[in-house]
């Protein structure tokens, strides 16, 4: 059970980081125009 919880947290973190990277890349592309 604890291992599953740790993996859930890692999944949430990876999704959050990927989302942040995409958003920052999109804003950077918009600002460049």
From Swiss-Prot:
Keywords: Cell inner membrane, Cell membrane, Membrane, Transmembrane, Transmembrane helix. Induction: Expressed at fairly high levels during late logarithmic and stationary growth (at protein level). Expressed at low levels in stationary phase (at protein level). The keyword Membrane applies. The keyword Chloroplast does not apply. It is a single-pass membrane protein. The chain crosses the membrane at residues 10-29. It is found in: Cell inner membrane. Disruption phenotype: No effect on iraD expression. It comes from the Bacteria. Pfam families: YtiC. GO terms for cellular component: plasma membrane. This is Protein YtiC.
